[in-house]
Amino acid sequence: MGLETEKADVQLFLDDDSYSHHGDVDYADPEKFADSGHDRDPHRLNSHLKVGFEDVIAEPMTTHSCDKVWICSHALFEISKYVMYKFLTVFLAIPLAFAAGILFATLSCLHIWIIMPFVKTCLMVLPSVQTIWKSVTDVIIAPLCTSVGRSLSSISLQLSHD
């Protein structure tokens, strides 16, 4: 439990087909990502996700655990992240993709067949409504406001200091 002077390296060996190559890739830099094969996030929707060990667990310089503990925790972190992600995607990815597909199909159908025809109908009717509203304003509201304004403009107040 003393001060460790030697640095130890951690290496995980996984099959190329079964593990994502994006573990330490900065998604904001496309040049680093170009050689990693098929890009599953071409629009960088999840570039904010940082799930590297150093981004989650860090020890300050004044308090370090033993190198073996650090190495084992790093290895367990990477393995558990890998296994849990695979486990969750096996059980959740297909049902959630199905639900998202139904949701987006429903929203698209509503937008195409209900919302846009309603908006277009309103835009077709608005010029005639605008003409009617202008006539009502000119005939009723404008004279009323003018007479009220003239009546109230003749009122004067005088304050006296008694």
Curated annotation (Swiss-Prot):
Example GO molecular function: protein kinase binding
Which cellular component, as a GO term, is one annotated location?
Answer: nucleus
**Superkingdom in the source lineage:** Eukaryota
Q: Name one GO biological process term.
A: skeletal muscle fiber development
Tell me the residues on which Phosphotyrosine occurs. Answer: 19, 27
State the InterPro entries in the record.
Caveolin, Caveolin_CS
Modification note? Phosphorylated on serine and tyrosine residues. Phosphorylation on Ser-36 appears to modulate mitosis in endothelial cells. Phosphorylation on both Tyr-19 and Tyr-27 is required for insulin-induced 'Ser-727' phosphorylation of STAT3 and its activation. Phosphorylation on Tyr-19 is required for insulin-induced phosphorylation of MAPK1 and DNA binding of STAT3. Tyrosine phosphorylation is induced by both EGF and insulin.
Signal peptide (UniProt feature, chain positions): none
Q: Give its localization.
A: Nucleus; Cytoplasm; Golgi apparatus membrane; Cell membrane
Xref: PANTHER family? CAVEOLIN, CAVEOLIN-2
Q: How does it assemble?
A: Monomer or homodimer. Interacts with CAV1; the interaction forms a stable heterooligomeric complex that is required for targeting to lipid rafts and for caveolae formation. Tyrosine phosphorylated forms do not form heterooligomers with the Tyr-19-phosphorylated form existing as a monomer or dimer, and the Tyr-27-form as a monomer only. Interacts (tyrosine phosphorylated form) with the SH2 domain-containing proteins, RASA1, NCK1 and SRC. Interacts (tyrosine phosphorylated form) with INSR, the interaction (Tyr-27-phosphorylated form) is increased on insulin stimulation.
What the protein does comes down to: May act as a scaffolding protein within caveolar membranes. Interacts directly with G-protein alpha subunits and can functionally regulate their activity. Acts as an accessory protein in conjunction with CAV1 in targeting to lipid rafts and driving caveolae formation. The Ser-36 phosphorylated form has a role in modulating mitosis in endothelial cells. Positive regulator of cellular mitogenesis of the MAPK signaling pathway. Required for the insulin-stimulated nuclear translocation and activation of MAPK1 and STAT3, and the subsequent regulation of cell cycle progression.
Q: Which family does the UniProt entry place this protein in?
A: Belongs to the caveolin family.
Q: What is this protein called?
A: Caveolin-2
